[in-house]
Curated annotation (Swiss-Prot):
This is Arginine decarboxylase proenzyme. It holds the Pfam family AdoMet_dc. Belongs to the prokaryotic AdoMetDC family. Type 1 subfamily. It is an enzyme of class 4 (lyase). The modification Pyruvic acid (Ser) is found at S81. The keyword Lyase applies.
């Protein structure tokens, strides 16, 4: 009898779908000093996470030196997935990646906020539905 009850419970469990929303893009013509400002970039990523209704776990950043390849990378781990900014100040260029899992978060609002703070002369934005179907 116990076994039958266990089977009944297993059959009534509803699987939660995997919702994946990925927004990413390239920013051109960004101020070089801003792209080198590790502290400000960290702050922008943290603010973007809150705006997008994400739950921040940890933020790490790195400064890379090496001529025309120098830059800053900021990566925020959020419960829902991640936000990343990678910069190339010499080229006035940055890439932004915002990926979330779940219905409640809005990666596009995080991307738009980052763009508003970096003020590129132009940018591209891409969206990919990475949900399990």
């Amino acid at each position: 009898m116990a076994r039958g009850g266990m089977e009944a419970r297993a059959q009534t469990q509803v699987k939660t779908p995997v919702v994946g929303k990925h927004v990413y893009g390239e920013l051109y013509g960004v101020d070089e000093k801003l792209l080198q400002d590790e502290g400000r970039l960290r702050q922008i990523v943290i603010e973007a996470a809150h705006i997008a209704n994400m739950h921040l776990v940890e933020v790490n950043s790195w400064r890379f030196k090496g001529g025309d390849k120098e830059g800053v990378s900021v990566i925020a781990l959020v419960l829902e997935s991640h936000i990343a900014i990678h910069t190339w100040p010499t080229y006035k260029f940055a890439t932004v990646d915002v990926y979330t899992c779940g219905e409640h978060s809005d990666p596009m609002s995080a991307f738009r906020y980052i763009v508003s703070q970096l003020s590129p002369k132009r940018f591209t934005v891409n969206y990919s539905d990475r949900s399990y179907k």
